[in-house]
Amino acid sequence: MRQRTTIYNPYSSHDGIITNLNRTNFQLSSIPNHLFTIENKYTITTTTTQPNKSSLYSAIKELRIQTKFNNNESGIPIFSFHYEPGLNIYAVPQSNVDKLEFWQQVEQLIMELLGIKLSSQQWIANVNSFYYHDIQPQPLLNLKEGWKFNLHPKSNYDYIYNQDKIIIRELLTNVSEIEFNLESGIYKEIGLFLIDEKISTNDDLNLSGIRVILDEDSNTNNKEESIHKTMFHIKPRHRSFDDSTTITTTKIIPQGLHPILSTELNTTTIVIPTDFDVEECKFYYYLNLNKSLIFDQFQNIPIGSQLIINNGNKNLELPEYKINQWGNELLFEFEFDNDNDIPHHINLTVHSRYQLPQNNHSHSQISNVLNSLPNIFIGCNVKEGNLLDKSPFDTKRDVKIGGNYEIYFTEDTVFYHLQNSDNSGNSGSSTLLEINIPHGKTTFDRVNNITSLGLLIGVLMILYAISIRVFMSTTSKTKRD
């Protein structure tokens, strides 16, 4: 097994950070108020360490799980954890396999990893995989005993499975101290890097530092031979604006059964990216929509945009309890030629699906539905796009599925992310919207009793009417006789 740990030091120097370093131990302590951001990447070859796993899940070509507990921890400016908060799962079958076998194996693998049961009906199809989303993040339950590592509680992680190997990345933020030790069976490569601001730009980051190798199979007894001074450049796929001001706020405008997702943009801090490699840019709005809500693609496209993606159940008439899929995936595109074209407001009107009456004795006539915030970003084609996946931190090197909106863009696209405000008016949560949907107030027993009583009364009325007619007919015949 291989472990590659990259430590990003936001300070201007590495002086005083390394507290111990030898062939078996590496300890670091951050500068006060300049805490580390760390990516741990574990690579396990399944054909050698778990030969039975490939045959057990032979119908699965690829499976990817991306979980985000904290929306603010995306790894900017180096690491790529820019997927949607909550749980995102992607699955691809092998060619020419039985569909039932594939879904049984997917269900079994997800139960093993997450402890949740997903049926095939809960997924939707996107451009290159099946996709499942839930606002509730899920930790990996347990890892194999032979792997000798565990993920940190509630760390954002990215799990990739295919027939040859398993890759797990996790992101740790605000780390003040960390220690690494030589372990049997694990090849460890630990990198400590800072960004050299003197020669770095937003589109070309220069990383400078050292790499330390901890490997029991190493033949060297010399500490210096395990330490490698390193400097390299990366062209980041995910970028941020120079101004760190929070620039989008999304809230719900109540409108009965037709609520509006209203996003306000601080256009004074949003400009067309001017990085050296940038060519054409467009503005995008991405949203995972709960199945209790309907998007009408014929009437409710936000002003100034065009609908690019609408994956999921598009039936506008079905009630919520008839929808098996988790919801819909939406992507809108706004064209703009200059800074004045950037929209000040984006309003997306959705409609509520009919909800089952609450089967309890509550007096509430409202269902509370939680939905993810929209992801708003600027996507740009760049020159020398082939350099993007040369970065060791670019996930497209390992897998082509997943990443939510990423799969709908070409390989030469970079993303400038607009941060959501914490002051969203969303029940104290900066990552979720709360939508109130009216519904009936009763119980199923009461509905059944009233229905049965109504039918009984109807039958009695019919019988009464028939008996009256028979009686009147008999009386009339008697009088004639």
Curated annotation (Swiss-Prot):
SMART domains: PIG-X. Pfam families: PIG-X (PF08320). GO terms for biological process: GPI anchor biosynthetic process. It is a single-pass type III membrane protein. Pathway: Glycolipid biosynthesis; glycosylphosphatidylinositol-anchor biosynthesis. The chain crosses the membrane at residues 452-472. Residues 473-481 are cytoplasmic. One of its GO terms (cellular component) is glycosylphosphatidylinositol-mannosyltransferase I complex. Residues 1-451 are lumenal. Glycans are attached at N22, N52, N72, N174, N206, N266, N290, N347, N360, N449. Keywords: Endoplasmic reticulum, Glycoprotein, GPI-anchor biosynthesis, Membrane, Transmembrane, Transmembrane helix. It is found in: Endoplasmic reticulum membrane. InterPro entries: Pbn1, PIG-X/PBN1. Belongs to the PIGX family. Required for proper folding and/or the stability of a subset of proteins in the endoplasmic reticulum. Component of glycosylphosphatidylinositol-mannosyltransferase 1 which transfers the first of the 4 mannoses in the GPI-anchor precursors during GPI-anchor biosynthesis. Probably acts by stabilizing the mannosyltransferase GPI14. PANTHER family: PROTEIN PBN1 (PTHR28533:SF1). This is Protein PBN1. It comes from Candida albicans (strain SC5314 / ATCC MYA-2876). The lineage of its organism: Eukaryota, Fungi, Dikarya, Ascomycota, Saccharomycotina. The gene is PBN1.
